């Protein structure tokens, strides 16, 4: 009798602890959702996150607040999310750096892209274009390569930071073309782009999410684009392959992660609202305006896409010898 009473009490206690958690999942979301962006405000990642967050507010029924936490090749923001409570109220933008590059760039990470995050879904991918200041003497990519070879070490390029897609795109370009161009890292795409426009640094790889308006306005000049086909918004700009640099497709991609252990109903809710946002007219127009390609789908599809990019970039990063620690 005593044993039966003890078991009954334990079962009741377990049920009382599980019930509030189950109700919290059923009521999700019932408070503000914090969206970590591991880059400064004003860059392509930030613009995209704010656009999608605005669309998601309508279906989630809660505010989605952007919290910019730049630094350490996205590792600062990633650490915040990896250690957050897995309740769906802390999510983040995740891109090539976190999901494809950092495991190859750092000897040791405080978290694993595979084990310490819940994959929620993809947002978009967008190609990078090699751009120069309008006053730079090279008019074509062929001219640019010839200038770089004739002036080894005298040409600088900007990037949003060490280990960014823009940084590694140029390093791959250098390896493919046999050129020596010095890296000048910035804290975000916006300040890097400003200095290329101002002529302080002559060139950079620039993602279309941030760069399309300044390319179209003539504030920078695009020599080539790192996509498989030409961008419809820039029909006069050749791809890198068309301009003679083969096997050099370079693009940035974005998706959403949460901490590991997010309950399946929460992941499903966030993924569904994300896909609704990507299908909305406002988000589709904004993406088209910035040369983006939407990446709707399931959490597993996004995870597989990210892992395929990690496998693609691993040998490239190893060949360049770049390390960030």
Predicted regions and their residues:
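N-terminal (or domain-start) structured segment
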Residues: 24-115, 154, 179-202, 296, ...
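Hinge/capping helix and adjacent helix->loop/strand transition within the periplasmic-binding protein
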Residues: 83-88, 104-191, 240, 253-286
